Amino acid sequence: MHELSMANSMVEAILDTAKKNNAIKITEAILEVGELTMLNPEQLRFMMDILREDTIFEDAEIIINMIPIEVECEDCGFHGISKTDEGMDHLMAVATCPECDNTHVHILKGQECNIKTIKIEREDENA
């Protein structure tokens, strides 16, 4: 269950960034999670909810945008959204070209796990 370690890293990074910017409250965090990370967004959100209890991040809205797998095929030159072999073990997704079914593809998107945006409130904004 790598959702726990990823959730912990994200919560720590969000709280550290908020602290460095003198935040008194975090109101929103937007995350980008690639399909090839094999992270379950519901489990990730659940873990983050537990880890952010009793912090300035506790009541913030968390938005998780899933990023589809984008590939470029070495054989036919296709460039676009891929499909994964759903018959494979869930621990190892295989991206294939939707045009020629080849697995010789360059993965362009779908592996990321980013904190895209953090919205905060500062004390001076409430004065």
From Swiss-Prot:
UniProt-annotated binding residues for Zn(2+): C73, C76, C97, C100
What GO molecular function annotation could you give as one example from this UniProt entry?
A: nickel cation binding
Q: Does the keyword Transport apply?
A: no
Keyword Calcium attached: no
Q: Which GO terms describe its biological process?
A: protein maturation; protein modification process
Please name the InterPro entries in this protein's record: Hydgase_Ni_incorp_HypA/HybF_CS, HypA/HybF
| NCBIfam families assigned | hypA, PRK00762.1
The family this protein is said to belong to: Belongs to the HypA/HybF family.
Q: What is this protein called?
A: Hydrogenase maturation factor HypA
Organism in which the protein naturally occurs: Methanosphaera stadtmanae (strain ATCC 43021 / DSM 3091 / JCM 11832 / MCB-3)
